[in-house]
């Protein structure tokens, strides 16, 4: 089983390594020109192919991230609640060459309209209790993304249920928006040039793994070692 998927796993590992090293993903060609071509004989097309056609379920990445996050919960906070937050974010893309690109409503669009041309990603975030400055705080780690498709309508029941959610939980919303902003601004989440839905989802989730490792999990592990 390992030998069957070893070449693909190796290629995806190199992609993750390049993202961690450069801390940016302008596009796969950028990763190849500035890092990958210097450490491997694999061709540029190999990395494009791995993203779009690899027989790898990236939900395994989400499971690993969740396991790492759960291990970071201190024993003294083992009885505290854990939260799963689901939200969506928009990514504007020009033209129609990307799979599943469509006109989307975005209340935060800054283009003079409430609509943008692009993709909608639904994300799930795990919020775990940790100690911070001798107080219980929640560390939010995005587990992964899935691209919303037109044939699957968005749930419209959320607004009716909002009044039942305690006000203090709104703080999680800030963590979600901060995560989106950081990934889009500093980790080039919006700059993917892969065209297929599967390829886009694979690359976006690889970026998310690196983001969690470098800015969330590592920082918390260092804090636990210090204190």
Language-model segments: residues:
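Residue-level signal for secondary-structure boundary elements
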Residues: 27-28, 59, 73, 77, ...
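Conserved, well-structured functional cores that handle cations and Mg-NTP chemistry
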Residues: 1-165
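Generic amphipathic alpha-helical segments used as scaffolds and interaction surfaces in large
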Residues: 18-22, 170, 196, 200
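Short intrinsically disordered coil segments
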Residues: 140-142, 170, 225-226
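Generic recognition of stable, solvent-exposed alpha-helical segments in well-folded globular domains
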Residues: 26, 42, 174, 178, ...
């Amino acid at each position: 089983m390992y030998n069957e998927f070893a070449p693909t796993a190796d290629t995806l590992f190199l992609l993750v390594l390049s993202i961690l090293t450069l801390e940016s993903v302008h596009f796969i060609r950028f990763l190849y020109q500035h890092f990958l071509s210097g450490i491997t004989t694999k061709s540029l097309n190999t990395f494009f192919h791995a993203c779009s056609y690899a027989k790898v379920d990236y939900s395994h990445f989400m499971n690993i991230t969740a396991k790492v996050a759960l291990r970071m919960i201190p024993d003294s906070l083992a009885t505290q609640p854990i939260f799963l937050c689901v939200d969506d974010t928009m990514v504007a893309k020009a033209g129609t060459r990307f799979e599943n690109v469509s006109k989307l409503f975005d209340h935060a669009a800054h283009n003079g309209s409430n609509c943008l041309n692009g993709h909608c990603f639904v994300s799930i975030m795990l919020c775990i209790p940790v100690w911070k400055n001798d107080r219980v705080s929640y560390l939010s780690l995005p587990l992964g993304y899935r691209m919303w498709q037109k044939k699957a309508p968005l749930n419209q029941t959320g607004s009716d249920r909002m009044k039942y959610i305690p006000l203090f939980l709104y703080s999680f919303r800030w963590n979600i928006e901060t995560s989106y902003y950081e990934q889009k601004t500093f980790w080039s989440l919006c700059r993917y040039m892969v065209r297929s839905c599967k390829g886009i989802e694979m690359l976006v989730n690889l970026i998310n793994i690196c983001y969690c490792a470098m800015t969330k999990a590592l920082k918390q592990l260092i804090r636990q070692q210090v204190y």
